[in-house]
Regions:
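Conserved short "hinge" loops at termini or chain/domain junctions
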Residues: 1-76, 85, 89-214, 218-309
Length: 309
């Protein structure tokens, strides 16, 4: 069962301060399906026990601290994600007359560049609040055992590459980056096994390894993660390619093109690591060869009665 920290009565008035640009006419029923979808997505990032606790406190109407702060951050993140998910339905009208857009004397639809910017801001702001929520939970572990003991948190802190690495090498923002790390955690572990452990039986993270991993992860994430789960550098690259092609190309083709840029850079860095490994192996072989005794040395004297050559 999907549980979300919202209720139908008074939704627009209560949630207006929590989401930028929300019109009072935007009622719960308008975006319920997207709220539920986002609720299901969030449950794959945060433990269900924590979500249940916050939802129960919200529905009871008396959320104490620190639950009230965590609940506020969660609602803000979910609202921005939900409006992003529902945006096309808010722009268009589907009826027996077909698919139309709303236009009257007072209002008209936004231009494409405006909706593109809106999508990016909705995702970026949602990431911001998810980041604050994760940080808040980590700062109050004693108050939130549902989070402290969760598999999600353990998996996050066991990742071999951290957010600072992604910020340094591929520009993933520190503000909101925790959400990307949790969404892409399985890809990070996959790359570490496929590309690092296959080269180094007992690997130790270095700048060269971290850089290669970050580019490889970004390339794979571009193809496998939802657009809203991708960091801003990738979203901008995809949007730029969309603009060049005016959507004449399929979305998958464009994602493959952007992915290929990251994977090509990653391959360069993996090749450099392979050369370094080969160089060390050759140096070791030379060292071992110098330590071995010479074989086949002839040491004959006149007292030898005979010998074979």
């Amino acid at each position: 069962m999907i549980r979300i920290p919202f209720k139908r009565d008074g939704f627009a008035t209560e949630m207006k301060p929590k989401i930028s640009g929300n019109n009072l006419s935007l009622e719960y029923d308008n975006i319920e399906s997207s709220l539920m979808k986002v609720g299901a997505d969030i449950a794959r990032t945060l433990p269900q026990k924590l979500i249940d606790r916050l939802v129960d406190n919200y529905l009871a109407g008396n959320a104490p601290e620190p639950d009230a702060t965590a609940l506020d951050y969660l609602q803000r993140a979910m609202l921005h994600f939900s409006v992003y998910e529902h945006l096309i339905f808010l722009i268009t009208r589907v009826s027996n007359d077909g698919v139309t857009v709303k236009k009257n004397d007072d209002e008209t639809t936004a231009y494409k560049y405006q909706t593109d910017e809106l999508k990016n801001k909705l995702i970026t702001t949602a990431w911001f609040w998810m980041n604050l929520l994760i940080q808040f939970l980590n700062e109050h572990l004693d108050d939130f055992p549902e989070w402290a003991e969760s598999d999600q948190r353990k998996a996050f802190f066991e990742l071999p590459i951290d957010l600072n690495d992604f910020n340094r090498w591929v520009g993933v923002a520190l503000a909101g980056g925790e959400y990307f790390m949790m969404c892409a955690g399985w890809i990070i572990r996959e790359v570490w096994i496929d590309c690092v452990r296959s080269r180094f039986p007992e690997p130790t993270k270095t700048d060269a390894i971290a850089r290669a991993v970050c580019y490889e992860v970004m390339g794979r994430a571009t193809l496998r993660l939802a657009y809203s789960a991708l960091p801003e550098p990738i979203r901008i690259d995809i949007d730029n390619e969309m603009g060049k092609n005016h959507r004449a190309q399929a979305d998958q083709f464009i994602k493959e093109k952007v992915s290929g840029i990251f994977l090509s850079k990653a391959e360069t860095y993996w090749n450099a690591l392979d050369l370094e490994i080969k160089k060390k192996e050759m140096d070791e072989d030379r060292k071992n060869a110098g330590d071995r005794p010479l074989l086949g040395e002839r040491n004959f004297t006149e007292s030898d009665k005979f010998f074979y050559t």
